[in-house]
């Protein structure tokens, strides 16, 4: 079974703003993540030791799985949106708690500005190197996502990762991956080949000079693999 698959729901369920679902040791809130009170309610009074967050990238992304809310704003509106979300987030974290923010390079300035404005310390930027690129209209085809890394000041920062961790997360995966348009991508070292049905082979240049990304999800259009987190 895919470790990223969620178990099936036993019955039809409904939710409304303010609802907090208790799923074993987990809590899931139907709420506004820019509202500090709603975020505190989701945490149930607890403070986080570490945070992973995957906000909208403001790239107007859409797929068969649907669209992402708050993903097509002006630069100024998006910056304010991030400031509110990060401010609500830092309010439910312990001093010294680590934070990871997946984001898009095209909005890197806004993500970093909002990160600092909320009070976080930036320590670095990690790179998730995917096993498959995403074909688009960019000159360089995107095969990575950046992840801001830092922590909430106010207490000693603790690190448990040893001294062998690097800023590039390459989680492996098959060298063969289907693309959205029915072709196949073949990765050979740092080379990426696209193979069409007529056996035509084209080499493309990815954005990173790999855990496999989920090929599709009916629940979220840009799902992250569990191993990455």
Language-model regions: role of each:
Residues 1-228:
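Core catalytic lobe of class I
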């Amino acid at each position: 079974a895919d470790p990223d698959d969620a178990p099936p729901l036993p019955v039809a369920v409904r939710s409304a703003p303010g609802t907090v679902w208790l799923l074993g040791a987990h809590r899931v809130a139907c709420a506004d993540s820019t509202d500090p009170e709603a975020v505190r309610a989701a945490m149930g009074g607890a403070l986080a030791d570490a945070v992973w967050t995957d906000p909208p990238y403001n790239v107007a992304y859409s797929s068969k799985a649907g669209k992402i809310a708050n993903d097509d704003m002006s630069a100024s509106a998006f910056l304010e949106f991030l400031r509110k979300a990060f401010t609500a987030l830092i309010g439910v974290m312990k001093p010294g708690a680590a934070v990871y923010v997946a984001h898009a390079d095209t909005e890197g300035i806004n993500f970093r500005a909002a990160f600092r404005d909320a009070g976080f310390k930036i320590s670095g930027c990690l790179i998730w190197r995917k096993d498959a690129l995403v074909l688009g209209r960019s000159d360089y085809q995107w095969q990575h996502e950046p992840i801001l890394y830092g922590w909430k000041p106010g207490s000693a920062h603790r690190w448990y990762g040893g001294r062998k961790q690097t800023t590039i997360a390459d989680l492996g995966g098959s060298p063969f991956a289907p693309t959205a348009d029915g072709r196949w991508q073949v990765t050979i070292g740092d080379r990426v080949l696209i193979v069409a049905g007529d056996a035509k082979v084209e080499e493309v240049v990815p954005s990173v000079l790999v855990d496999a990304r989920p090929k599709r999800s009916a629940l979220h259009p840009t799902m992250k693999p569990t191993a990455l987190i």
